[in-house]
């Protein structure tokens, strides 16, 4: 020890890691016994110091960080800029969230680093610093919360809240910050409670699966090894950690000299020699093969050499050591510890941000520009990227600073720029981040104000959202919310304000405004009426323009009609809001007034179908035949009713009309067999009959006979449904959520139909009736206390559980002479006399012979005859009457056909609300394509608002593609030079874009009239070429080179001028924004603008006209204003007209703060009036939306504050704190497939199993395939588990994990390919056992590798006692008894259960009988070890060991590739 006295005296503090290193070196040098004495003295010293020092912790010890103020200010400045960008629409919401999270996270991290250095420099003996940084109590992040800032938090859903907590716990939190931080705290408390139990259970399962693994033998004799080499991307630290304590599997040579022999254990000295060798010759050095538990050849134990050194002392593990239990506990224990360490943020954003380089002082920055090249940061800001390490100099007044910036960093300043102190000058790329787990998150953006939605690019009507109002964005674009709120007066008779007037915003509060705004959206009741009621009467010009691909029908919605259930005369359109028209879809119907039932009431409709395939039978046959035919024709035939229903992706239509037969029998319980046979003879149907209402057993009925009337079952909903709903499926119509289709196959034609009056009263059960069942009454007879009949005729009463039904059939009882001649259920035409009837006079009307039971009553037959009203069906009307000739002489290409159908079911009682009309026949317009049903058309209601008028269009696009989209024309076609202070969108004419010409000619849009909502409309002017001319935008002398040639091929519609041909004359707006001004000057016929040097003609007689974005012309009548939108307008005065024409056009959107003229624009918005000396901007807010975002709502739809606008889908990093990490570890151990297991291991094993036998051929293939598969998966699993633990700074030796993974992967499953005599297919056996059995039997056993979870592995051991004490006791024991299993009691648990000596430690030796040669080998190795340990130098260790800086340790484990590559010597 004498030479040791000359050593350097170290005077420095020692922390937890330093203490660990000291102890390990003491053990290496002095051995276990001596070290324990030293440590005992250390402990006494520590307690003594603690007593004398008596550290106390006061609030003064919490030193705040001086740099916090400007750091937070800096971050706030950046956030403010971000907010502004977002407000201008330059970035979208997700980007804003991401960047603000990043800004604040970087600030918080920088503060943390500052805090460390601040403590170290100012007060190294500070109690807070001492406790937290020595590892005694608390950790860095907790101290950071105390004296730094709490930083970002997550909400309960795990989403980031982008409002950071700027204060720390020493300063105290504001109320908002307190509430935000409560989320994380609560999550932490819950996690602690839940996860601690999980961690304990994990430990139990881990110990269970490996409890029988102990060191039983010196050497298993394996010749395999796993190669380790720093070339695989391992850091030297990790390399050293992997090697120390292992045993070499092969000799190691440097050059020709062997420096280490096989089976030698590796110490720190040997590792340092390896590292120096690798540094000297990185590519020539051979990989090092080591033995691991994976390479051990034993089945249920492990040998000393494959395990390596004991974790407690630097010698080989002793025989009889229970290494399995040690491994299970080493892995499980950190889990319990880590769950107790509740995270301060509850799953906050961790990692992944770049480190920042800040300038040391004010000065001018300089660097070599050749070494950098321009690029953009991930947020799109310009920066320089440097390839190699770059030295940057900052020249302050007296000092020259040099800052080194590592390669691949981004430089955020320019050369020769003046930088301030602590300004960020560069961003260092972070290494591989620990966040490989991504999750997809939706973020909804809500509107911040009321207004209308506009968008400025194509928006797809995505096919999967056909019925919704969701649209996909194909490319990044802006959505604009044009501000304005709706003020609807109840009566639109008079308004003080003229069109375009400025209204005083305070005015509306004084008088009450009835707000119909919500209910009055266009969807109000599902039916819209065209405003041309006289379409069918005369050939009026319905301005529905027929185009090849689209037509528009103007609609009008009457508010006062909401209360009416029946639509008034005219065409009604029945379309879902975003409906799809297929072939044969009905899209409109017309109710012919001739088929309108009078207001009196209800009855039955009778008709006969004539199918298209059938020949039509003429009625010019003889009388008898005609009698038969008639009966045939007018009887309902159920077999024609039973059509197939088409089921497609919208689901099958519900069958609302149940069959009657069962119901009636069950309800009234009367046997109908007798009656049924008679029906069979006559070929009629069950519906035509219903049993008597009374009890059939009554004698009176037997005596006199009762009458049966044909009625279908009464479904309760039949009486109160509005008439539109009873368009039946039985005509071959199929309903799909509002669209109806014909199936042509089953279409029937009807010549005429009949209406028979009939009345139904549904009365409460308790009401007393004034009339008897089966009696005949007259009109207006009193039925109950307060109801009277409207018809005369026969009364039937049916009592049900909840109510009483009373029916009155109009008509008379008629007594025929002979029963055989009269057939029930037929209709008799008026001209024919009835042979057998007593009356001989001709009847004017048709009659209907009610179906009857023929019961003899005093030798008389009787039949019930009812009057019927006949309606003839005429042929379908010609389409030419529907649509006038197209004014633009386009060919008729819209395929519509007209179909009439009866809207009531045959023989079904139609009951309507009294005093309303009911419609019998409905004429439908059906979309008719020649091709098959591939074609679809989208129908949408377009609501166009031009200033104060709201017009609704039904737009039907008959496009070939499934995705149709509306194009709004804001494309830039800039031409000519622009002065510097101008906007870069030059003279875009918003209605003309060169790029769209070709496609427009294919999909023409129609121009339809826009109808005023209050029943007055101006006629639409179709402008021909003589009416309009193009305004040249660049005709003034300032831009001589920029004159554009007119494109002669542009269709006339495209070349309206920037103001839509109409330029209003100058109005004098005063600077007061609330002044009411009036636009009353009429336009002259010719308006001459001196600056433009060009005259152009204006439509005369109109006060104002505008073409809106869809190129539709609208004319305003400024005397009537129904729904004034209170527009927030903003005036911009500019000097002369010529200056602006190059820049501004109507409908253009302008962002805030754009410098158009000498003044800045103070609000963003849309230009919507342009006058000679000023223009008006309607305030609007832009929202940027990215590709693939979903837009909610329609173009021009009114949105209210808080309505959802856009939904973004973006990926965000999942934070990997241990509360999520522990379940990951467990899932890997349990071999469950989870998303974040990057390559799913089970799938990988399948692949290996399949491919390798194919490559190598069968008998060998299985053996090698299974081995390689297992080896591959083992290494991958070890790396994954280590990654989770290392990300938490927990260090577990690989060999513990290896022992457990070895158990999980050691089984193979016998496959069915080759039958063997030993194992049954599907049986799980150990891999080594399978190999040995194959060798012993001289036949190949086919098997494949399998990945068991730890639970399944615990239930597949050799000991059934251990399995039974783990789980499923009864099942395990019963199986074991049936199989006659034997337990050899090799493990610990079996022996503990049975009370035997456990076979480890001292109880181990009686099992082992060493052979003498074994002993010699053992002593030789002992000598080798002694020699090697004496070679180690204590000081050598002290200097060479990796530095104790704890920050470095965290960066060592980010290896992306697996550190091991297996090697096999076979």
UniProtKB/Swiss-Prot annotation:
Its EC number is 2.7.7.6. This is DNA-directed RNA polymerase subunit beta''. GO terms for cellular component: chloroplast; DNA-directed RNA polymerase complex; mitochondrion. In plastids the minimal PEP RNA polymerase catalytic core is composed of four subunits: alpha, beta, beta', and beta''. When a (nuclear-encoded) sigma factor is associated with the core the holoenzyme is formed, which can initiate transcription. It comes from Agrostis stolonifera (Creeping bentgrass). It comes from the Eukaryota. Zn(2+) binds at residues 220, 296, 303, 306. Residues 621-631, 639-651, 707-725 have a biased composition (Acidic residues).
